[in-house]
Amino acid sequence: MNKRHSGQRVVVGLSGGVDSAVTAWLLKQQGYEVIGIFMKNWEDDDDSEYCSSNVDFIDAAAVADVIGIEIEHVNFAAEYKDRVFAEFLREYQAGRTPNPDILCNAEIKFKAFLDHALRLGAQKIATGHYARVRCVAADGRVLDAAQAQMSDGRFELLKGLDPSKDQSYFLHRLNQAQLSKTLFPVGELLKTEVRRLALEIGLPNAKKKDSTGICFIGERPFRDFLNRYIAREPGPIKDDKGRTIGQHVGLSFYTLGQRQGLGIGGLKAKGAQRGGGEHAPWFVARKDLATNTLWVVQGHEHPWLQSHGLSAQDASWVAGTAPQAGRFSAKTRYRQLDAPCTLAAGAGAAFHLSFPEPQWAVTPGQSAVLYDDEVCLGGGVIAA
């Protein structure tokens, strides 16, 4: 075992998945004193066929046993409902499409969890996210861990080395204090390497499927879940010519760019998947809360689905201050390729982005996240 971090305590968020399991193993190999924490962030439906919390904890405990570390079960459900889920519902009721995983990272995993870890005497926390952190001196030199502790360098959030798994988009609201206490070991690896390591180590969850979907919804049908908290308010579905062609169940249950579940047909004629025409599929293009109208269009390339700019609010910048106006790249949704853009400052915590190439289905409530090459600068919530 490498002893270079001997005596330093790090608390790892063990989710039951393979990424956090390998994270814990790597840190122990580096000489850290590792403690595992399993976070329970959702209280209801533990007996539901869709809830995996109990199974995940069993998997996390089995991992801790193999690695030889302590594990603690901590309940953050109250904090989650207050700081994340309440905002999630408010956004949907306002007709927007929020990303609760971004808020969960900022408020729970890197705030409530971090605070708990510090009370345990930890110097650092770690998670299985595919991202990286580095500390840069005022003169631009990249500092190692020892130098970073002794300097007032600036911490940067970088994309994970595996482009297919990069999760910096979800972490863009982290600040300097949070990043200074955070380690992302698997961000330096490809997912295939993580799986290989897990198998070589003999971790019991080495072949476990990656989790998908919003953390508190799991694999259950999203509309069924949302309907438990938001009442349905049916209204007209209209096309771009103003013709009523159907009825929606409530604007909160739809998002821009949505194609499935509209209930208005739309034949998938061969060769018409992305173009217009009478047989092209329908997409949600606009939501009018004032008239409770859902506007839809045919064809992936319809002008109503294309945007050359956006306005964002509630900006959060990793460096603590907004970058200077200029040219960057941005994502307006997860897994989107970086798109060249120009940043312009707005009033207060607002900003504007313009794109030389049109962006598809830019969605209010989602996040616009800025990048300077591999460095994630931060971002804000899309307003329009």
UniProtKB/Swiss-Prot annotation:
The keyword S-adenosyl-L-methionine is assigned to this record: no
Disulphide bridges, residue numbers: C104-C215
Sites marked Interaction with tRNA: H129, Q366
GO process terms (BP): tRNA wobble position uridine thiolation
Record gene name: mnmA
UniProt keyword terms in alphabetical order: ATP-binding, Cytoplasm, Disulfide bond, Nucleotide-binding, RNA-binding, Transferase, tRNA processing, tRNA-binding
Location of this chain's protein in the cell: Cytoplasm
InterPro entries, per database record: MnmA-like (IPR004506), MnmA-like_C (IPR046885), MnmA-like_central (IPR046884), MnmA-like_central_sf (IPR023382), Rossmann-like_a/b/a_fold (IPR014729)
Protein name: tRNA-specific 2-thiouridylase MnmA
Region called Interaction with target base in tRNA, residue ranges: 99-101
Region (Interaction with tRNA): 165-167, 333-334
GO molecular function: ATP binding; tRNA binding; tRNA-uridine 2-sulfurtransferase activity
Organism: Albidiferax ferrireducens (strain ATCC BAA-621 / DSM 15236 / T118) (Rhodoferax ferrireducens)
